[in-house]
C-alpha cells in the first residue's frame, strides 16, 4: 500500500487539505500526555498516515526519531515499527491525526515494547 497523495485546494474563504478520497479508512486523534509514550508497535494489515496537530510530537519510526512540524505528515507503512511520544518538558499534550488504511482491527497490534506492561 502506498501513501495517499494529499491534495491542497485553495478556496476564496481559505483552503482545505484532502488526505483520502473514497477509500475505506479509520480516523482517530491520538493524544499523548507530557512524558508519556505509546507502545513500540507494528501492524500487519494496515498502514497509517499520521499528521502532527501540535508542536512537540516525537515519532519513532524504524529506529529513527522524527520531530515533525505542525501539520506535517509521516507515512507509516504496514509492518513498520513505530511509536508516538511527548517529551516530559513539553507544557501540553500532543496530538496526531491517525488515518489507518487497510483492514483496521485494534487487535492488529504487535507490541515490541510497552512501559505500561501490556502485551
Give, region by region, the residue ranges found by the protein language model.
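Short hydrophobic/aromatic patches on the structural cores and recognition surfaces of FHA
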Residues: 55, 71, 96
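Double-stranded beta-helix
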Residues: 2-10, 87-119
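Glycine- and acidic-residue-biased ligand/ion/polar-headgroup-sensing regions
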Residues: 45-63
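Glycine-centered loop/turn positions within well-structured domains
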Residues: 38, 47, 57, 82, ...
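A short glycine-rich, His/Asp/Glu-containing loop-to-beta-strand
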Residues: 4-46, 99
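Short acidic-glycine-tyrosine-enriched beta hairpin
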Residues: 62-81
Amino acid at each position: 500500500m502506498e501513501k495517499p497523495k494529499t491534495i491542497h485546494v485553495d478556496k476564496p474563504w481559505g483552503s482545505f487539505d484532502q488526505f483520502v478520497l473514497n477509500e475505506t479508512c479509520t480516523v482517530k486523534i491520538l493524544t499523548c500526555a507530557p512524558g508519556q509514550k505509546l507502545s513500540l508497535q507494528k501492524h500487519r494489515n494496515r498502514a497509517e498516515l499520521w499528521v502532527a496537530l501540535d508542536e512537540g510530537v516525537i515519532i519513532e519510526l524504524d529506529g529513527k526519531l522524527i520531530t515533525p512540524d505542525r501539520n506535517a505528515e509521516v507515512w507509516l507503512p504496514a509492518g513498520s515499527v513505530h511509536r508516538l511520544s511527548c517529551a516530559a518538558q513539553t507544557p501540553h499534550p500532543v496530538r496526531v491525526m491517525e488515518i489507518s488504511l487497510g483492514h483496521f482491527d485494534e487487535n492488529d497490534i504487535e507490541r515490541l515494547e510497552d512501559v505500561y506492561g501490556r502485551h
